[in-house]
Amino acid sequence: MRCKGFLFDLDGTLVDSLPAVERAWSNWARRHGLAPEEVLAFIHGKQAITSLRHFMAGKSKADIAAEFTRLEHIEATETEGITALPGAIALLNHLNKAGIPWAIVTSGSMPVARARHKIAGLPAPEVFVTAERVKRGKPEPDAYLLGAQLLGLAPQECVVVEDAPAGVLSGLAAGCHVIAVNAPADTPRLNEVDLVLHSLEQITVTKQPNGDVIIQ
């Protein structure tokens, strides 16, 4: 597979934030009399505000906004257990050394994404697309289209690296190449992605003299 740049999801792709995410949302579910399992089955890969609107249907915008602010604070400050996933730091350092452009494109808000990026010790991205920068979150294509644009690349010149079904669908809808890493086996359209991997350590990247990037 050939490309010119990378668009990485953050949670579940570059960082293992699953314990922190599930802890925050399970506690939120219990406070609202909901089954944690039902909430956790919905939230992954989606913007927090999307999930809150889903589970708080019928509530006022003010109530939803207040819950978002509270949840955002919890997720941005309770970072215990968050670590970089195997191969993430080495891959990003390799891209930087080779002069290959890359971005982080996350459904998380800026405070949450910055906190997790920092605690995991990841290199700084050239572009950081968070929930505040798009009107429609994943699985819509907006976030990955913006990421490609900010890197100065066409969507088809980018490869999206994702773990969540919503993110895989977003990357495909944007017209990007897609690598699914640890994606659930029942992810819709998984048969349409370029590579299905279990770890970032399986990715080999080589930059050609013409600027093309070969991924194996």
Model-derived features with residue positions:
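N-terminal helical cap/lid subdomain that shapes the substrate entry/recognition surface
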Residues: 1-98, 111-114, 122
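A generic structural signal for short
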Residues: 13-14, 79-80, 101-102, 132-133, ...
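Conserved SAM-binding loop
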Residues: 14, 41, 84, 102-105, ...
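Ser/Thr-glycine-rich phosphate-binding loops at phosphate-binding pockets of nucleotides
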Residues: 13, 17, 106, 167
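N-terminal start-of-chain detector that recognizes signal peptides
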Residues: 23-25, 74-76, 100-103, 131-133, ...
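Asp-based, Mg2+/Mn2+-dependent phosphohydrolase catalytic module
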Residues: 1-4, 93-96, 109-216
